[in-house]
């Protein structure tokens, strides 16, 4: 069509086509180590939800040029009001829309960012939810894991006492532990802030490691592979959350507010 060719022809790519191009783009960024797994998984989820929402509209947009400020605003209202999500979730979606908008401009699908002018809800209005696990529940957790899953207990110890993030825990290897110095190294590749850190391990963590005989495994093995035991196969940190949700919450009758990450928020107590 000569009328389309005279304008920006990229603006007439379909919304679905451009979303697929963006999916391929962020997948390459993840494969090249630019995006962390958590970021990549989040963006893929946001993109999928955006497409599903558009498909559900009475008059969905067809071409990418139709993805304008009004559509972005309506989508954020859907996330925050219709789906009854938190302010933080709404802000996270706005961040995603900003990144997606930058992609659209940089790749000449649009001349301006469609989400420009949309504001985050101020952080001062957000009360960060932190759930502290009751000391008696911490004891029940410890007792249950001592009997049923001591390897998972080690992961709990690293999160609770050493304050290592779940993603970092999943990437730790046997060789990162210095038994003589009783330290563990969080390498720059693993660390969230991209800086290497050496952290002292409490004696009870060392004792549990010795009890589990993890030092009999090759140094290049991950501390938490399949079944939370040392092995050569990398397993995503999702396995920690899944076990907490599907097993511990059921067996110990923990409230939904208790999450694996709550161990990091909970003050140092006897576990």
Each model region followed by its residue ranges:
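Short alpha-helical segment immediately N-terminal to, or the first helix within
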Residues: 79, 158-159, 172, 270-271
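Short linear capping/connector segments at secondary-structure termini
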Residues: 7, 117-124, 189, 222-230
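Short basic/aromatic active-site micro-motif
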Residues: 42, 67, 254-271
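Active-site/catalytic core of tyrosine-dependent DNA strand-transfer enzymes
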Residues: 202-255
């Amino acid at each position: 069509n000569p009328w389309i060719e005279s304008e920006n022809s990229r603006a007439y790519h379909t919304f679905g086509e451009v979303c697929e191009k963006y999916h391929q783009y962020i997948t390459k960024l993840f494969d090249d180590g630019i995006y962390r797994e958590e970021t990549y998984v989040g963006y893929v989820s946001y993109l999928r939800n955006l497409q599903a929402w558009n498909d559900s509209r009475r008059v969905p947009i067809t071409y990418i040029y139709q993805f304008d400020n009004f559509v972005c605003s309506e989508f954020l209202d859907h996330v925050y009001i219709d789906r009854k999500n938190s302010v933080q979730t709404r802000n996270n979606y706005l961040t995603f829309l900003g990144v997606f908008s930058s992609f659209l401009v940089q790749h000449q699908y649009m001349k301006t960012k469609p989400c420009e002018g949309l504001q985050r809800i101020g952080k001062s209005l957000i009360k960060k939810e932190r759930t502290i696990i009751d000391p008696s529940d911490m004891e029940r957790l410890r007792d249950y894991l001592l009997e049923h899953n001591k390897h998972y207990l080690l992961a709990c110890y690293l999160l609770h006492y050493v304050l290592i993030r779940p993603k970092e825990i999943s990437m730790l290897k046997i060789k990162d532990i210095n038994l003589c110095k009783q330290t563990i190294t969080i390498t720059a590749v693993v660390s969230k802030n991209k800086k290497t850190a050496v952290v002292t391990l409490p004696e009870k963590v060392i004792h549990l490691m010795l009890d589990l005989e993890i030092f009999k495994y090759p140094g290049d093995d991950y501390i938490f592979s399949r079944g939370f035991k040392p092995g050569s196969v990398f397993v995503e940190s999702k396995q920690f959350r899944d076990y907490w949700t599907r097993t511990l919450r059921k067996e110990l009758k923990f409230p939904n507010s208790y999450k694996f990450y709550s161990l990091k928020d909970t003050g140092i107590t006897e576990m």
